C-alpha cells in the first residue's frame, strides 16, 4: 500500500512492504487527485494535481474490512478532512467558511453533544441554553452574513428564538422555523435540516480573534434545536446586489397584496397607512 505525505518542502511517497520495512522516495507520478482549489488569500493559482503545499484534502482515517471467500478480499475505506479545517476556526474573506457547531469551546449546562444522523459529517449540538465558538479572522477586513444549519421541532406557536452576541457587534436574533415533527431526532433525514440567516451583516477586522456566543431566549424548553454548523458568507458586490434584488421583489409581492385589482391599481378599502409603512420598511 502506498501513502503520500508531505514534510513541508516536498511530496514524498512511503511504500510499506511486508518484512522489508519502509522505503521513502520523492513522488514524480500522480495516480489520482482530488480537486485543488485556492483556499488562502496569499496562495498562488490552483494546480491540476496536489503539491506539497497545495492540496484540498488530508487523509484522516482508514478502515479495513476482510470479506471471507474462496480468495480472501480486503476492502479499504478512507475518510478525508478538507485542508481549510484548522484548530483556529479561521474565517476566510474569499470563501464561505463552514464551522461545525461541535467545535464550540464552551457549552451551557443544559446543552450537549449528540450523535449525528450520518449525513452531517459529524455530531450535533443539542442546543438548550448557550454555547460559544472562538474563531480567528484572516488578514483582511471583510463583512459577512452569518447563518446556521439546524433542525427544530418547534411549532408556529412554540418556535425557538436564538440570539448571537459578538464583541463590538450589535446583538443579532432570529426565530427558528420548525423543520421536523415529533420528538425523535435520532434518525433525521437530510430534508429535516434547514439554513437560516441572521438579517444584519457583521464586519470583522484583520486578524481579529472572535468569540460568538449563541443563546436561546425562548421559554419553550421542550422544543428541540439541533445545530449542525455555522457559516460565514463574505459579502461581495454581486451578493449585495442579489440581496437587494430579492428584497425589492419581496416588497413588490407585499405591495401587490394591498390592491383589490392590481391591474387597475385599486387599493383595498380596509388598508391603513400603517400597513403601507410596514411594507416600505
Swiss-Prot record:
The name on file for this protein is: Insecticidal crystal toxin protein
Is Transmembrane found in the keyword set? no
Keywords attached to this entry: Sporulation, Toxin, Virulence
Q: Which family does it belong to?
A: Belongs to the delta endotoxin family.
Q: Report residue spans for region: Antigenic epitope.
A: 54-78, 91-104, 108-116, 131-148, 160-172, 189-196, 208-216, 221-236, 247-256
Mind listing the GO biological process terms from this record? sporulation resulting in formation of a cellular spore
Listed Gene3D superfamilies? Galactose-binding domain-like (2.60.120.260), Pesticidal crystal protein, central domain (2.100.10.10)
- Task of the protein: Promotes colloidosmotic lysis by binding to the midgut epithelial cells of insects. Active against Mamestra brassicae.
GO molecular function terms here? Answer: signaling receptor binding; toxin activity
Q: Does the keyword Amino-acid biosynthesis apply?
A: no
Amino acid at each position: 500500500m502506498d501513502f503520500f505525505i508531505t514534510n513541508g518542502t516536498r511530496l514524498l511517497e512511503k511504500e510499506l512492504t511486508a518484512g522489508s520495512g519502509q522505503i521513502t522516495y520523492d513522488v514524480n507520478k500522480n495516480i489520482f487527485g482530488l480537486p485543488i482549489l485556492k483556499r488562502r488569500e496569499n496562495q498562488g493559482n490552483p494546480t491540476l494535481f496536489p503539491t506539497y503545499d497545495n492540496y484540498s484534502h488530508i487523509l484522516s482515517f482508514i478502515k479495513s474490512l476482510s470479506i471471507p471467500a474462496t480468495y480472501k478480499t480486503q476492502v479499504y475505506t478512507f475518510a478525508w478532512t478538507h485542508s481549510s479545517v484548522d484548530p483556529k476556526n479561521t474565517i476566510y474573506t474569499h470563501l464561505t467558511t463552514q464551522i461545525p457547531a461541535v467545535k464550540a469551546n464552551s457549552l451551557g449546562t443544559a446543552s450537549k453533544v449528540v450523535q449525528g444522523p450520518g449525513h452531517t459529517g459529524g455530531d450535533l449540538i443539542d442546543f438548550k441554553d448557550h454555547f460559544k465558538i472562538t474563531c480567528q479572522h484572516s488578514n483582511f477586513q471583510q463583512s459577512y452574513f452569518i447563518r446556521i444549519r439546524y433542525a427544530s421541532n418547534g411549532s408556529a406557536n412554540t418556535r425557538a428564538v436564538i440570539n448571537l452576541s459578538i464583541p463590538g457587534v450589535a446583538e443579532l436574533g432570529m426565530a427558528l422555523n420548525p423543520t421536523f415533527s415529533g420528538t425523535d431526532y435520532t434518525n433525521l433525514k437530510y430534508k429535516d435540516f434547514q439554513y437560516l440567516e441572521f438579517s444584519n451583516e457583521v464586519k470583522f477586522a484583520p486578524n481579529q480573534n472572535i468569540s460568538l456566543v449563541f443563546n436561546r431566549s425562548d421559554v419553550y424548553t421542550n422544543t428541540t434545536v439541533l445545530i449542525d454548523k455555522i457559516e460565514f458568507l463574505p459579502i461581495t458586490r454581486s451578493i449585495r446586489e442579489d440581496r437587494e434584488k430579492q428584497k425589492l421583489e419581496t416588497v413588490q409581492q407585499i405591495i401587490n397584496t394591498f390592491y383589490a385589482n392590481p391591474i387597475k391599481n385599486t387599493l383595498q378599502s380596509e388598508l391603513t397607512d400603517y400597513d403601507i409603512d410596514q411594507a416600505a420598511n
